């Protein structure tokens, strides 16, 4: 079965107020030694008057497969019928609220004592970020449960330095489609200027231009937003630098290697309709291993 929405005429004003947020933060900090610092922080953010699409009384159109029918043909689907329900409009209104809360820990090593060659820090954060809309709990796009950062810098002597950074983040939410559905259009069949007759949309067949086939759209579901998570993100970057003086100027030569173990980190997914009417998915990833050589000069 599939549904299509008919939008009711917009009656509301396009004016809306500003979104509001109140932040509550508490933190503790303690020097364990002259070089080691421990810091922890907890927070809560209360979001109000978040802007969402206005819901108005409209109509959903519903069609089902005909048993044994050809799904590429209009005859393979029942005639679309109206199912009274709510519809999302493009009118923005302040009609949602949300919250974000979490805790962060930081252990930092300062390079403050004579003979100390290493500095860096380790951090960990645990967080939740949700909005509440239409009795649904929906994560924000930036909702990330766990993040870890490990950063270090070591002096090798003779103006050589080695630095590294490892990052980890659990997956961000995204909306996974639930399948495909025929596209339903409203046509003006009585020439009164009002499209009101629902039909299953078709186009010329690629295989046979003399016949038409049903147009399919990706079905994300009516209340299915951010129902899945991307894979975790992590990578290791290193940097080697050498400082020297040439021609009475300060020179720094460096080698950067980003994503040294060539991790495939997913940015997102692109969904499309395959020729065999299955749901296709293409992974969009960040850059692979990327070495860079360069220098800088201070005049």
Where are these regions (language model features)?
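Extracytoplasmic loops and strand-loop junctions of Gram-negative outer membrane beta-barrel proteins
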Residues: 5-12, 73-76, 84-92, 132-135, ...
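Outer-membrane beta-barrel proteins
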Residues: 12-16, 28, 91-95, 110, ...
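C-terminal beta-signal and adjacent terminal beta-strands/loops
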Residues: 46-49, 159, 167-217, 229-235, ...
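Residues on the lipid-exposed face of transmembrane beta-strands in outer-membrane beta-barrel proteins
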Residues: 16, 26-30, 103-109, 122, ...
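Outer-membrane beta-barrel translocator domains and adjoining extracellular loop/strand segments
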Residues: 1-4, 42, 51-57, 64, ...
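Residue-level detector of the transmembrane beta-barrel scaffold of outer-membrane proteins
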Residues: 1, 37-39, 117-121, 151, ...
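Gram-negative outer-membrane beta-barrel transporters
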Residues: 44-46, 58, 62-173
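Outer-membrane beta-barrel signature, preferentially recognizing the C-terminal barrel domain
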Residues: 1-39, 43-47, 69-73, 82-102, ...
């Amino acid at each position: 079965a599939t549904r299509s929405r008919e939008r009711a005429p917009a009656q509301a004003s396009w004016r809306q107020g500003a979104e509001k947020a109140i932040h509550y933060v508490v933190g503790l900090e303690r020097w364990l030694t002259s070089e080691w610092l421990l810091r922890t922080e907890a927070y809560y953010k209360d979001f109000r008057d978040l802007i969402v699409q206005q819901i108005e009384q409209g109509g959903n159109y519903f069609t089902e497969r005909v048993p044994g029918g050809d799904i590429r043909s209009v005859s393979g689907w029942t005639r679309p019928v109206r199912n009274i329900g709510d519809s999302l409009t493009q009118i923005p209104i302040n009609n949602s609220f949300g919250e974000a809360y979490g805790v962060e820990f930081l252990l930092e090593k300062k390079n403050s004592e004579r003979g100390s060659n290493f500095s860096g820090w380790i951090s960990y954060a645990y967080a939740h970020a949700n909005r509440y809309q239409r009795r649904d709990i929906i994560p924000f796009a930036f909702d990330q449960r766990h993040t870890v950062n490990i950063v270090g810098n070591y002096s090798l002597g003779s103006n050589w330095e080695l630095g590294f950074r490892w990052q980890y983040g659990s997956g961000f939410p995204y909306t996974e489609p639930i399948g495909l559905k025929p596209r339903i259009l409203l046509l003006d069949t009585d020439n009164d200027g009002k499209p009101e007759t629902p039909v299953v949309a078709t186009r010329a067949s690629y295989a046979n231009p003399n016949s038409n086939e049903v147009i399919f759209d990706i079905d994300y579901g009516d209340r299915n937003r951010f129902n899945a998570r991307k894979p975790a993100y992590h990578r290791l970057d290193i940097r080697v630098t050498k400082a020297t003086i040439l021609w009475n100027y300060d020179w720094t030569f460096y080698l950067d290697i980003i994503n040294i173990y060539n991790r495939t980190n997913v940015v997102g997914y692109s969904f499309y309709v395959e020729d065999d009417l299955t749901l296709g998915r293409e992974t969009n990833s960040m850059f692979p291993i990327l070495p860079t050589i360069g220098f800088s000069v201070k005049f």
